[in-house]
Structures are given as C-alpha cells and as structure tokens.
Swiss-Prot record:
Residues 126-135 have a biased composition (Basic and acidic residues). This is Autophagy-related protein 19. Residues 254-367 are annotated as: AMS1-binding. There is a cross-link at K213, K216 (Glycyl lysine isopeptide (Lys-Gly) (interchain with G-Cter in ubiquitin)).
Amino acid sequence: MNNSKTNQQMNTSMGYPLTVYDECNKFQLIVPTLDANIMLWCIGQLSLLNDSNGCKHLFWQPNDKSNVRILLNNYDYGHLFKYLQCQRKCSVYIGEGTLKKYNLTISTSFDNFLDLTPSEEKESLCREDAHEDPVSPKAGSEEEISPNSTSNVVVSRECLDNFMKQLLKLEESLNKLELEQKVTNKEPNHRISGTIDIPEDRSELVNFFTELKTVKQLEDVFQRYHDYERLSQECDSKTEIASDHSKKETKIEVEPPNERSLQITMDQRDNSLYFQLFNNTNSVLAGNCKLKFTDAGDKPTTQIIDMGPHEIGIKEYKEYRYFPYALDLEAGSTIEIENQYGEVIFLGKYGSSPMINLRPPSRLSAESLQASQEPFYSFQIDTLPELDDSSIISTSISLSYDGDDNEKALTWEEL
C-alpha cells in the first residue's frame, strides 16, 4: 500500500499520464501541467500528430468507456482535468476517422460515459496489443482515408438533436438574408406613367402634389396611408369591444337585497321578548345604536332600546332579551335601528315569519349610512369597572301610547 501511494505521488510530481490515439498509432504522454495550451503543444510535438491543432477535432474519454466527448473550450478541458487530478487514466483521440476505427460514440457534455461490454473489452485489448509494435510513418501515410470515412460514426440522440437545431437556425438565417437581398435588389420591370388633372379650385391638392418630386416621397405618402388604414381598423375594433363591454355591464344584475340586510329573529316566551340579530351586511354595525319596536295594534306602542356601545361585526350574531313584555306580536309591527345621530339606518316589518330582514331606507343618505357603519374604536374594555358573575348590563326603556302621557318603565338585558 505504501509503494502504491508513493508511485501516485511520483506520477503527480512528474506530470499526468495521458494516452493519445490517432488512426495508426498510440502514444503515452506525460503532461507536466493541467493547461489546455500546454497539452495541445505536447500532442503537437509528435511527428504524426502535427496537424492535431489544425483540421482535426480532439475527443477524450476515461479508459474502459464506449463513448467520447469533444474538446472544444475550457469547459470541456476542465472535465478532463478533473479526471486526471483524481489519478484516473484517460485517453485522447484525434479525428473522426479514429473514432470510426475504434467504434466509439460521440456524446455531449451532459451525457454520461458508458461502460464497455465484455465483447468490446476483448476487442479493445486486441487493438492495444496490436499497437504495441511501432508503425512507421510511411505505413501510416500509405493508408488513405476516403472522404466518406466518417459517415458511419455513431452519434447520440441528444447530440444529433443539438446539431439539427443549429441547422434549422442556420437555414432560417439564410432564408431571411436571401429575402432581404431580393427586396433591396428588386427593380421594377416596367414603369407606369400617367397624368391626373386636378381642378384649379382644389388648391390644397395642387400644393400637396406639387411638393412630390421623387419616388421616395411618393412611397412615404403610400406608407402613411396604409398606417392610417391600420390605425382606423384598430380604433373600430376597440370601439366594438367597448360597446360589447357596455352591453355586458347593462346585463349585470343588482345584488339581491338580502346581501345588504340585518336579519332579526323574534321570539316571545315567559313574558319576555327575544331579539337575535345577525349582521348580514358588508360592513360593521357601529355601537351606540338604538332599536325601536312599534306595535301594529289599535294603540301603537313604541319601545326605544339602547343597544349598547358594542359593535357587531360582519357575519356576527348578537342576542337581546327584553322583559316584561306581555303583549301579543301582530303582523305589521315595525322595527327600526337608529344611529347615534338619530337617523334611521335600517327598517323592516314583522310578518308571519319570525325572521325579519332590515334594509336601509331609500331616503337615507350615503353619508349617514357611512357614518353609522364606522367602527366604534374609542370604546376600551379596560375602562369598564370590574363586575361579578351576578352583574347584569341594563338600562331603561320607555313605553308610550300615542295621545297618552302615561309611561311605563321597562328594563332590558344583553345576553
């Protein structure tokens, strides 16, 4: 083990071993440093490889692989240098004819190197044994390679696709260049001449066409006319689109009333009147509002209830209980909710169903509705006095008859 490590250190200090193949020879090189220019110079020093930097491509592979990669730029050389630094044996092949001779496949830098099959390994060993005897330069020069010697080189599918993409781009560029040359070099086969008599009273036309002296000026007029036609068509199309949008907007249905309503469910039991309020609007119902309930009997009674400082959020419930209340509920009773400014912001009537939808009255101004729906931010919980479990939030309500001065005090509590 110590001897092998010592040999590796000696090889690294002396250089990096590299096997070089051409169509007739095999050479063992020691590259002193990992530099592309120095490696090319070392390969070019061989008498039979003096054209390796010129007309022939260089390919490389780790030993015992069946495909090779081309050496074109620093990126490709960098991959080769990583293998050499790891003390892996690598080979360099010169020219496509050498690849055909050794039956090697060209791959891109994104493909993996493929291992040799057992049959290919035997053939590789036989070829290496055959190359142990040096071949004279004359023998190599006598073998001429036909122009189609690289026609049977195997190329990977990905590499072939890249070649096809480059060929398509080249074809498009050539077609575009040819079309531009035809347009610039096009000459009219014949000239059209003629005269148009313009009446003298059309002074604007006379002055306009008098200024046209060259064919270029006439082409400019023609081009401007076509630009005007194109812009006119675009404006017409935009006008049609705008009209279509306006038609669609007229067909938009108005939101159903239930989307802007307060839902109140009423229930009467145990000499008490229960109100369950659900905020089904799109805004928060502010605090400090009042609920007015008016009977529909012969002698209507109006109850004014302070709803307290708490706001009611969107899609939130709140329940109230008012007692004592011994009257019977009749259809036609009115429920109103007033804001802190005394304006009615929601209105509805009690019918056969216990659920009532309160909606904003049509006479209510937008400013009043907005002011009533502003959230009550000045209220703070920490300002309330501490209460025990038996405490009840209550206030007084007035019960009055129309035309009668008698009043009866009621109380309410909030659950």
